[in-house]
UniProtKB/Swiss-Prot annotation:
It comes from the Eukaryota. This is Photosystem II CP47 reaction center protein. It is a multi-pass membrane protein. Disulfide bonds: none annotated. GO terms for molecular function: chlorophyll binding; electron transporter, transferring electrons within the cyclic electron transport pathway of photosynthesis activity. It comes from Chaetosphaeridium globosum. It is found in: Plastid, Chloroplast thylakoid membrane. The keyword Lipid metabolism does not apply.
Length: 508
């Protein structure tokens, strides 16, 4: 029977051995991709400047995930935090990649073995001798094992009892490191930014999974439920599995885009909402204000601001600024950040301090407008000089830098002031190297943006897959004319296929 390309998976419908084979091969491909991608990223990753050229600026995708689980060292002698390493041990970045590739090879061989030896006694009913799968029991086994893994991760790996812990940082992404995390069992455990919730939720969900698995192993489903939900049909398994996957994809798309303890900004870059809400700008102002109240000068106060914090307060690190179809890392857009020029402070000829209105996330161009402390427009860069009232020249705006490379330097010529006013629209002002990577000056998104876009799209796709396969299994009698009570497990690749005249259609 010839099959069109979109129906080829039906060849494993009544063949448990080869169903296992294709799933093992799929896992081999996933594991092989992960290991290979890690090696590729390690080959192109430059660990020399974790502050101004972190992994997320370089477009690393799998390295952040390896890092958040506790791996920080490389066999190349470097650490993600900038220190030199002499003995990285097995669980280095390269070690993790190698283990995935070795696992992929073993799974590849296992898949071939199961494809060749598909007709095992294990898959035959002891009473009838016919091929059959006890799907509710298999569900119980999977639930029990995944619960065990979930519990083990939360109770041992995350807590540091037997493992490194996970990446934990402060709210501003400045002091991150791998450390053990104690479970948070109170209401604080439900705070998405509290790492303690990761430990407690894995422990709780793991215990629930273990108990649910044991329940499904020891209790048989009622006959009416078994028939009503088509528990004897493997397409029911496909449908419910797709549901689990699309739900997980929606959840992680949300936690990645909006931010959480599981997606630290040091590894994945800031979120767009931190730019929209002036999150870093407010913290910087607060720190400067504290320093001034301690008697420091403006220059000294701004010099105390960590370059890392200032760099977060720059629109080019906002994942919403990169178009979805602009390929490449952030460094390929605005360039490799070299240094912070300092905080630009603007004043008019009357001595009022002026603030440049910052560009919102969804604008490519935005008028350059300078406001005073009360929000009144005092200066701008006009579109048409003939009608201008607030031009830099007319208002006599000057700019002075505090902190950074231009600390103490001031400019009064209008052309230079306009240049820095335009750049101040984008947050703190940095110097970029655009020559090394031939960067084109067009913003790119961070791995946070790619991950969200990919998972939201696949979640939607898989949602329709769940509806499709759920509908097929629940209404098999309507769509294919096959009695839903027909439980014959028959020869590989021959029966229960659409358009196959030899399929039995009714239960005896």
């Amino acid at each position: 029977m010839g099959l069109p390309w979109y129906r080829v998976h039906t060849v494993v419908l009544n063949d448990p051995g080869r169903l296992i084979a294709v799933h093992i091969m799929h896992t081999a491909l996933v594991s092989g991709w992960a290991g290979s991608m890690a090696l590729y990223e390690l080959a192109v990753f430059d660990p020399s400047d974790p502050v101004l050229d972190p992994m997320w600026r370089q477009g690393m995708f799998v390295i952040p995930f390896i890092t958040r689980l506790g791996v920080t060292k490389s066999w190349g002698g470097w650490s993600i935090t900038g220190e030199t390493v002499t003995n990285a041990g097995l669980w280095s970045y390269e070690g993790v990649a190698a283990v995935h590739i070795i696992l992929s090879g073993l799974l590849f061989l296992a898949a071939i073995w199961h494809w060749v030896f598909w007709d095992l006694e294990l898959f035959r009913d002891e009473r009838t001798g016919k091929p059959s799968l006890d799907l509710p029991k298999i569900f119980g086994i999977h639930l029990f094992l995944s619960g065990l893994l979930c519990f083990g991760f939360g109770a041992f790996h995350v807590t540091g009892l037997f493992g490194p812990g996970i990446w934990v940082s402060d709210p501003y992404g400045l002091t991150g490191s791998v450390q053990p995390v104690s479970p948070a069992w109170g209401a604080e455990g439900f705070d998405p930014f509290n790492a303690g919730g990761i430990a407690s939720h894995h422990i709780a969900a793991g215990i629930l999974g273990i108990l649910a698995g044991l329940f499904h192993l020891s209790v048989r489903p009622p006959q009416r439920l078994y028939k009503g939900l088509r528990m004897g049909n493997v397409e029911t398994v496909l449908s419910s599995s797709i549901a689990a996957v699309f739900w997980a994809a929606f959840v992680v798309a949300g936690t990645m885009w909006y931010g959480s303890a599981a997606t630290p900004i040091e590894l994945f870059g800031p979120t767009r909402y931190q730019w929209d809400q002036g999150y870093f700008e407010q913290e910087i102002d607060k720190r400067v204000g504290t320093s001034l109240s301690e008697g420091l000068t403006l220059s000294e106060a701004w010099s105390k601001i960590p370059e890392k914090l200032a760099f977060y307060d720059y629109i080019g690190n906002n994942p919403a600024k990169g178009g979805l179809f602009r390929a490449g890392a952030m460094d390929n857009g605005d360039g490799i950040a070299v240094g912070w020029l300092g905080h630009a402070s603007f004043k008019d000829k009357e001595g009022r301090e002026l603030f440049v209105r910052r560009m919102p996330s969804f604008f490519e161009t935005f008028p350059v407008v300078l406001l005073d402390s009360e929000g009144i427009v005092r200066a701008d860069v006009p579109f048409r000089r003939a009608e201008s009232k607030y031009s830099i020249e007319q208002v006599g705006v000057t700019v002075q830098f505090y902190g950074g490379e231009l600390d103490g330097v001031s400019f009064s010529d209008p052309a230079t002031v306009k240049k820095y006013a335009r750049r101040a629209q984008l947050g703190e002002i940095f110097e970029f190297d655009r020559a090394t990577l031939k960067s084109d000056g067009v913003f790119r998104s961070s791995p946070r943006g790619w991950f969200t876009f990919g998972h939201a799209n696949f979640a939607l796709l898989f949602f329709f897959g769940h509806i499709w396969h759920g509908g097929r299994t629940l209404f098999r009698d309507v769509f294919a004319g096959i009695d839903p009570d027909l439980d014959a497990q028959v020869e590989f690749g021959l029966f229960q296929k659409l358009g196959d005249p030899s399929t039995r259609r009714e239960a005896v």
